[in-house]
Structures are given as structure tokens and as C-alpha cells.
Amino acid sequence: MRPFELSSDEQFTYLHKIEIDITEKCNLSCKSCVRGCDNFKSDVMISLDKIQRFVDESIELNYQWERIGIMGGEPTLHPQLSEIINILYDYHQFNPSCHFWTRSNCIIPFDFPSWIEYQKNIDHSYHHAFYVSPQDVNYPMNKRTCHVLYDCGLMYSHHGYLPCCNSNVHIRAFNLIDGIQSLKNVNIESMMRLCEIYCKHCGWYMMDDFESGHLMEYPDTYMSETWRKAMDRYKLVT
């Protein structure tokens, strides 16, 4: 894989946007879910300690996040969602310019704070192929990583800091290594080392933009051999 081909300004933006997956549990089974909620189901929830560490490190390092998403799975299924929001509020006070947002298919079970954008009425029926391993279809791994990195930024989950929002499912499907455990060690180099491991399994690597590229040639329910074997293994142990 070639080096990250973004300008210094674009690299800065990538490293200052993040989605926090607070749960892997979902009450939908959308086909080709990039979080793996259809074929690689999991009920794992992030701990409050993990959220507290994220906030403490961000403040200690004076890390100026531009955007923080509270995601899943389905975030409203986390039984401590209100406590998570209370912890994140400390960072909101530290950096009021940071844009917090969340997306849900449910009704928020409490009065939602105005400092978090609550995205409702999302079309959950639209998905395209995801479970297509580039190595299965002889797609060359000779370009920079896909648009997801600079559109969505990093991911933070119970696995640590990860290079993109699709990373969690790769870890549990293929039993890959965890992410970076401390924010002070998050940089372009550490994220690209993880991309070398994760991207070879990801169908979105074959996208040029959100709706263009080689991946769009496959039906939305298509699953390549590497993913089928991973799914069979996963179902045997869960």
C-alpha cells in the first residue's frame, strides 16, 4: 500500500475527527453492514472507564477534536448512554467548538442535550456491498486508503484507537490485533500500520468515492470467499 497521499492540512483533519463506537449491539440487521451487525453480531459495550480515559487524555494532551460521533451498533442500546454523555460533556466544556453528533434508529430514552446533534430519519435500507476482500477479486493493493478515512476520521472503541469506522468488524471477524491504546501514540504512521492489516479485507478499499469504484460492480448482498470463511468461523465460536 502506498503512503497516505493527503496534504498536511488533510492529514490534520483526518486525525481530528473520530467516531466512538459505544456498542457493537444493534436491533437491526441491515445487509452488508459496515459494522458487521448482520453477520458478525456482538453485544459488547464500551466501558465508562474507556470513555473517561478518552476524555482525560484528550484534555491532558490539549487535543482539539473537530468532530466526535457517538455511534454503534445502535447507541441507544447502551444501558449507560446518559452516563457516557455526562463524561463527554467535560470535553465539550473544554472544547466548545467541537461538533458532537449521533445517529439512531430509536427514540432517545431521555432529554437529549442540545450540544449533541441528533440525526434522525436516516435511511437504514440503503447499503452496498462491503464483505468483498480485495485479495479475493485480484484487486491491487497499490493505492492510498479509501475515502472513509478523510470523510469520517478515526474510530475509538473497546479495542482502542483505530484507523477508520469500519475497523471493529475486521478485528472480530479475522481476530486481528487491537488498536492503539493511548491517544499520545496516535499519528499518521501508527494508523497507516494498522491500515496495512485491516484494509486488505475491506471492500471499501475498492471505492474511489462514496458511490463510485470497483466495489459498486458487486451486488449489495455479495460476500467473497475470505469473508464467508470468517463468518462460518465466527458463528462456530459465538
Please place each PLM-identified region on the residue numbering.
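A short acidic (Asp/Glu
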Residues: 79-82, 111-112, 165-166, 211
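Histidine-centered beta-alpha loop that forms part of the nucleotide-sugar donor binding/catalytic region
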Residues: 104-105, 120-121, 166
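Accessory C-terminal segments flanking Radical SAM cores
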Residues: 133-238
